[in-house]
Amino acid sequence: MEKILVMNPGSTSTKIAVYQDETPLFVESIEHSQDELKPFENIIDQYEMRKDLILATMEKNGVHKEDLTAIVSRGGLLPPIKAGAYRVNEDMVWQLTYAPQNEHASNLGAVIANAIATELDIPAYIYDAVTVDELEPLAKVTGLPEMQRKGMGHNLNMRAAAMKYAKEHNKPYSDISVIVAHLGGG
């Protein structure tokens, strides 16, 4: 049986869950107050604090890190990529730590996942990074020839909501057109 740690670091919380196969063992949102985050000059500086809180929350819920078989996190602000899953590697961690496209809490996901996974010798993945860019060429038009719109957004949440809708209506995801709004803290 697989035990997978799932993480979603956001601006005001870190949502985590551990699944045994497809069954959630626990789901928890670790809230971060402004006072708690204030000492950190850059978001990446929150790495140790958030990693420690994730591990402590797992222990509190009776899950030992040694029992994990994989880790999956929300993807951060990488260069533009296609939607889907990517195995975390050192180049990705370097990009998110030292040269992210922008400062964002999602950048912590792959960094934390990689640290825990490396220690345990298990795989770490990201899924649907913020910088998923699958826009049609026309959607990139801004009105200024020298500027193109970039495909960026809360792709993880939006694609999951659209996939859920498709499943509930017994339609292939590729055959639906839906409008999804993300209303979050970031």
Each predicted region: which residue ranges?
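Glycine-rich anion/phosphate-binding loops
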Residues: Q46-L53, Q101-G109
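Short glycine-aspartate micro-motif
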Residues: E2-M7, L68-V72, D175-H182
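Phosphate-binding/catalytic loop of phosphoryl-transfer enzymes
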Residues: S106-A110, N114-G186
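Conserved active-site "lid/cap" helical segment
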Residues: E31-V72
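Gly/Ser/Thr-rich loops at beta-strand to alpha-helix junctions
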Residues: G10-K15, G76-P79, H182-G186
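Short, basic, glycine/proline-bearing loop/turn elements
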Residues: P39-I43, W94-Q101, E146-K150
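Short glycine-rich, Thr/Ser-proximal phosphate-binding strand/loop in the N-terminal lobe
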Residues: I4-D45
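Short beta-strand-loop/turn "lid" adjacent to the catalytic site in phosphate-handling enzymes
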Residues: M58-A105, A129-G143
